[in-house]
Curated annotation (Swiss-Prot):
Family to which the UniProt record says this protein belongs: Belongs to the STXBP/unc-18/SEC1 family.
Localization of this protein: Late endosome membrane; Lysosome membrane; Early endosome; Cytoplasmic vesicle, Clathrin-coated vesicle
Protein name as annotated: Vacuolar protein sorting-associated protein 33B
Function per UniProt: May play a role in vesicle-mediated protein trafficking to lysosomal compartments and in membrane docking/fusion reactions of late endosomes/lysosomes. Mediates phagolysosomal fusion in macrophages. Proposed to be involved in endosomal maturation implicating VIPAS39. In epithelial cells, the VPS33B:VIPAS39 complex may play a role in the apical recycling pathway and in the maintenance of the apical-basolateral polarity.
Record's keyword annotation contains Flavoprotein: no
GO molecular function: protein-containing complex binding
Length: 617
């Protein structure tokens, strides 16, 4: 059932060191404010902080009370206030208001602001404008890498996607470069580097500068990770927009996995309480089903339950000594496994109920038709029906974006019709969201008469191929064209299978989308790793309209062991999905690699749409 790791698979580095470093730095910063203090924490730092330093650790370092940073001012009686926050102007104003309120009341306190993952000049400017810069001390908690699992690191920066890919804000690029620099300092240099995307290129260039400045630190170190591959999210929007059908992806789509854990409600726990569950390799049941297609999961869990019952039944024929050994050595483990099994069976039942209600099969059929380029009229009618029935506005928006990207933009008539129907169904407040989606290249309108293609053809006759490529790229950039259909053919993203695709024994990465589609991002990674360069992929890169690069340091590669050369760090800027993670884990098992994932945040289609939306749910 579950795909086992190959016996010759390389060992993963120990990333627990990253947690220890982050915890030690936070404790050091807290101790700079000696004595009892109240700690104000920004909402989206609470879950990451809990994975690093729980309440008992904070209490050991004289944190008295914990408060959540909210819109309204919180009253605290402590003489020392510490703020653990993201570098946001809104939050700086909140702190400034609190300090100014104390000043008006004639109250003298000490204030310390800890900004994570880095301090921005704009934040200090706001404090200065509000007249409190001299009253507070500002520090930086460079916490940018959180190990969510043995092979998954997250920067926990979900805003990265909107900030860069919509607003063009480059402030997080330094954070990415610093994170890569930390990894190369702790785990040795990366002999082979590949990347695609503008954000990736900027992050790589800045990281190389940091490496050159402190080269002496990693010189002579044996590399622990042989390859690093950096990829921008806008290289492949299609994969992120598709419904997920591997178990971990479905759990994320249905219940929202947050910072590596999920809240299972009463419908899953079969009690009147919700339960927060950590989803990682330590959960033995979950680790066996996380990468599986959902159609296989129920059968596996049923068999697991029967095996577990058989182990319990062994007690009947035991003598006292055997029973004593059973209780001391096995019973605790069996009870834990039984608890986890019950939870995952409950989660599966809940997913099935929700998906049956949504007519999930019809939805998947429509998505597959869009990916393959068949029955586009029928698919458009399905989306219109979706909008008319006022199914989730996010879901309708996602399908419109998938139609747009796979068709290289909507024809003007369809664009106007779908947009009008959407605004009438869900409200005119969504108008700005359409503007955002257009700017990001997610939902676009084809140029009438395909004017750009005609101009490109004329240009290509007048200049050399190389220059024509550059000018064509410029036109493509203006039009935000996806070229998905052409890329799909070049990279064979739609497998041609005789008969039914066997999801129990998958033949390729397409199993993560029921055999209908190989994730574009994963196929690019596979092709580049096979070639050890971008050679032979020039046309694909041109169609993607992205910067690409490859760099090999032979001196470092010579020092690397054969095991480390089979370890590949994949960096997703703008977020990655659990489907992509499952697909690359499968590829690793097939080819003898082991993939490690670093992402700005784990994402899915709903989070992608919410990031673009101007209407907050």
């Amino acid at each position: 059932m579950a795909f086992p790791h190959r016996l010759d698979a390389p060992e993963l580095p120990d990333f627990s060191m990253l947690k220890r470093l982050a915890r030690d730095q936070l404790i050091y910063l807290l101790e700079q404010l000696p004595g009892k203090k109240d700690l104000f924490i920004e909402a989206d730092l609470m879950s990451p902080l809990d994975r690093i330093a729980n309440v008992s650790i904070l209490k050991q370092h004289e944190v008295d009370k914990l408060y959540k940073v909210e819109n309204k001012l919180t009253l605290s009686s402590n003489e020392q206030l510490c703020f653990l926050v993201r570098p946001r102007i809104k939050t700086m104003r909140y702190i400034a208001n609190l300090v100014n309120a104390d000043k008006l009341a004639g109250r003298v306190r000490k204030y310390k602001i800890i900004l994570s993952p880095q301090k921005f000049y704009a934040c200090e400017m706001v404090l200065e404008e509000e007249g409190v810069y001299g009253d507070v001390s500002c520090d930086e908690w460079a916490f940018s890498l959180l190990p969510l699992d043995v092979d998954l690191l997250s920067m926990e920066l979900p805003e990265f996607f909107r900030d860069y890919f919509l607003e063009g804000d480059q402030r997080w690029i330094n954070t990415v470069a610093q994170a890569l620099h930390l990894l190369s300092t702790l785990y040795g240099p990366f002999p082979n580097c590949y990347g695609i995307g503008r954000c990736t290129k900027m992050s790589y260039d800045l990281w190389r500068k940091l490496e050159e400045e402190e080269d002496s630190e990693t010189k002579g170190r044996r590399p622990e990770i042989g390859h690093i591959f950096l990829l921008d999210r806008d290289v492949d929007f299609v994969t992120a927009l598709c419904s997920q059908v591997v178990y971990e992806g479905l759990v994320d789509d249905t219940f929202r996995i947050k910072c590596g854990s999920v809240d299972f409600g009463p419908e899953v726990t079969s009690s009147d309480k919700s339960l927060k569950v950590l989803l990682n390799a330590e959960d033995k049941v979950f680790s066996e089903i996380r990468n599986e297609h959902f159609s296989n999961v129920f059968g596996f869990l049923s068999q697991k339950a029967r095996n577990l019952q058989a182990q319990y039944d062994r007690r009947r024929g035991m003598d006292i000594k055997q029973m004593k050994n059973f209780v001391s050595q096995e019973l605790k483990g069996l009870k834990q496994e039984h608890r986890l099994l019950s939870l995952h069976i409950g989660a599966c039942e809940s997913i099935m109920k929700k998906k049956t209600k949504q007519d999930f099969q019809e939805l998947i059929k429509t998505e597959h038709a869009l990916l393959e380029g068949f029955n586009i009229r029928e698919s458009t009618s399905y989306i219109e029906e979706h909008i008319d029935r006022q199914v989730s506005p996010i879901e309708s928006l996602r399908l419109m974006c998938l139609l747009s990207i796979t068709e290289n933009g909507l024809i003007p008539k369809d664009y106007r019709s779908l947009k009008t129907q959407y605004l009438q169904s869900y409200g005119p407040e969504h108008l700005l969201t359409f503007s955002n989606l257009r700017r990001a290249g997610l939902l676009t309108e084809q140029a009438s008469g395909d004017t750009l293609t005609a101009v490109e053809n004329k240009v290509s006759k007048l200049v050399t191929d190389k220059a024509a490529g550059k000018i064509t790229d410029a036109f493509s950039s203006l039009a935000k064209r996806s070229n998905f259909r052409a890329i799909s053919k070049k990279l064979n993203l739609i497998p041609r299978v005789d008969g039914e695709y066997d999801l129990k024994v998958p033949r390729d990465m397409a199993y993560v989308f029921s055999g209908a589609y190989v994730p574009l991002s994963c196929r690019i990674i596979e092709q580049v790793l096979d070639r050890r360069s971008w050679q032979g992929l020039d046309e694909v890169v041109r169609l993607l309209n992205c910067s690409d690069f490859a760099f090999t340091d032979m001196a470092k590669e010579d020092k690397a062991s054969s095991e480390s050369l089979r370890l590949i760090l994949v960096v997703f800027l703008g977020g990655c999905t659990f489907s992509e993670i499952s697909a690359l884990r499968f590829l690793g098992r097939e080819k003898g690699y082991r993939f490690i994932f670093l992402t700005t945040a784990v994402t899915n289609s709903a989070r992608l749409m919410e990031a673009m939306s101007e209407v907050k749910s």
